[in-house]
């Protein structure tokens, strides 16, 4: 391997983002943040690194295994590089914005770094953009966050946006009602995660028929809700189901084009969520575009939010359109170049007056150049 190749080698899961992708991501993030702002979400910007004890407090505890840690040479305290921005926004809401009126609407965008990638997302560093609605326990807050993030993807041009709704607190409510705990609960939880109805039947005892019915109820929202409503659920689980039905009703009224499915037993990735949660997908894409749901904010404050994963969002979009690049030969009056930029051109100025404009334009990736008689196409 050459010295140049060695210098370009990056750790697994990390990459350089090159033109035009870097600019494309920036423009997409700008569009998202502008859309969030128009809906009353104020932007915050937490630091990339902070003390471990605050970064991993509360909902942040769910990211502990994915957090890089370093020793702060100034304070001699452990610090963590954020693996997710939601816990940081929750901290800001509970502390620096603790006296602000509720509900509090915040937005954010930035890079996160994780210890390990996954099969569907091997990248360990990627961009996030999202919203948090803090201080409301109303089903309308859940619906607002779901609809806003799905609508934002629609506005960007993502095809066939859909949301898979989950109730990570539903199964624990059933377990509690039937006295299922310890190793039995762990085995059943693993079986439910893999939709293993046979193991549920063998291990579930009196709760087995109900748990099997929950597995079978997964599917389009209307059918899933009909099947869930036909089940004799314990009171706490029934309350979760009723809230789900209300959110589906509100979301369907606000964004009828959004395809909704329900998986009543899904839990993976929602470990710190305390209520209705969701995953966003696009047509013909296996990777999730984002996740959201209800969680407990700082001081036990009710909160809900959603995070979009920019690498997946960009992959779901048509590629960036080539910029209209115009080569302007050296010596061209500056006012002329300014006028062309005002018309939407990207101008690339020549540096060598003796250079051949046709050749230089090709070298600079310009499909047009400024000639003596105006703009001409580069052959």
From Swiss-Prot:
Its annotated compartments are: Cytoplasm
Question: Principal localization?
Answer: cytoplasm
Q: Which UniProt keywords apply?
A: Amino-acid biosynthesis, Cytoplasm, Histidine biosynthesis
The record's listing under InterPro entries reads:
aa-tRNA-synth_II (IPR006195), aa-tRNA-synth_II/BPL/LPL (IPR045864), HisRS-like_core (IPR041715), HisRS/HisZ (IPR004516), HisZ (IPR004517)
Keyword match Acyltransferase: no
The record's listing under SUPFAM superfamilies reads: Class II aaRS and biotin synthetases (SSF55681)
**An example molecular function term from Gene Ontology annotations:** histidine-tRNA ligase activity
Q: Which Pfam families match?
A: tRNA-synt_His
The metabolic or biological pathway listed in the UniProt record of this protein is: Amino-acid biosynthesis; L-histidine biosynthesis; L-histidine from 5-phospho-alpha-D-ribose 1-diphosphate: step 1/9
Q: Please give the biological process terms from Gene Ontology that the record holds.
A: histidyl-tRNA aminoacylation; L-histidine biosynthetic process
| A GO cellular component annotation in the UniProt record | cytoplasm
Other noteworthy facts: This function is generally fulfilled by the C-terminal part of HisG, which is missing in some bacteria such as this one.
The entry sums up its family as follows:
Belongs to the class-II aminoacyl-tRNA synthetase family. HisZ subfamily.
Q: Per its UniProt record, what PANTHER family does this chain match?
A: HISTIDINE--TRNA LIGASE, MITOCHONDRIAL-RELATED (PTHR43707:SF1), HISTIDYL-TRNA SYNTHETASE (PTHR43707)
| Oligomer and partners | Heteromultimer composed of HisG and HisZ subunits.
Function, please?
Answer: Required for the first step of histidine biosynthesis. May allow the feedback regulation of ATP phosphoribosyltransferase activity by histidine.
What is the name attached to this protein's record? ATP phosphoribosyltransferase regulatory subunit
Q: What is the lineage of its organism?
A: Bacteria, Pseudomonadati, Pseudomonadota, Alphaproteobacteria, Rhodospirillales
């Amino acid at each position: 391997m050459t010295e140049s190749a060695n210098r370009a080698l990056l750790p697994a899961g990390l990459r350089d983002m090159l033109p035009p992708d870097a600019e494309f991501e920036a423009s997409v993030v700008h569009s998202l943040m502008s859309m969030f702002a128009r809906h009353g979400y104020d932007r915050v910007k937490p630091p990339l690194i902070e003390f471990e004890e605050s970064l991993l407090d509360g909902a942040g505890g769910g990211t502990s295994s994915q957090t890089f840690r370093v020793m702060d040479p100034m304070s001699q305290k452990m610090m963590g590089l954020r693996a997710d921005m939601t816990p940081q926004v929750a901290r800001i809401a509970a502390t620096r914005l603790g006296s602000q009126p509720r509900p509090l609407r915040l937005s954010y965008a930035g890079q996160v770094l994780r210890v390990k990638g996954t099969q569907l997302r091997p990248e360990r560093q990627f961009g996030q953009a999202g919203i948090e609605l803090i201080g409301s326990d109303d089903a309308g807050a859940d619906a607002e966050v779901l609809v806003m993030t799905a609508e934002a993807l629609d506005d960007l041009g993502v095809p066939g946006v859909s949301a898979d709704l989950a109730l990570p607190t539903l199964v624990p409510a059933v377990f509690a009602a039937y006295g299922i705990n310890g190793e039995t609960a762990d085995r059943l939880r693993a079986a439910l995660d893999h939709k293993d109805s046979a193991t549920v039947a063998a291990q579930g005892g009196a709760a087995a028929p109900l748990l099997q019915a929950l597995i079978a109820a997964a599917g389009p929202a209307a059918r899933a809700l009909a099947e869930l409503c036909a089940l004799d659920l314990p009171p706490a689980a029934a309350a979760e189901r009723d809230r789900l039905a209300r959110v589906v009703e509100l979301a369907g009224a606000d964004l009828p084009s959004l395809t909704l499915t329900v998986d009543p037993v899904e839990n993976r990735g929602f470990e710190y969520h305390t209520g209705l949660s969701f995953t966003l997908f696009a047509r013909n894409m296996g990777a999730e575009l984002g996740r959201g749901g209800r969680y407990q904010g700082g001081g036990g404050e009710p909160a809900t939010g959603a995070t979009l994963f920019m690498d997946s969002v960009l992959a779901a979009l048509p590629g960036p359109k080539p910029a209209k690049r115009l080569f302007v030969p050296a010596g061209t009056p500056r006012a002329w170049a300014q006028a062309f930029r005002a018309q939407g051109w990207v101008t690339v100025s020549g540096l060598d007056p003796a250079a051949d404009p046709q050749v230089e334009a090709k070298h600079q990736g310009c499909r047009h150049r400024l000639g003596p008689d105006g703009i001409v196409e580069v052959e």
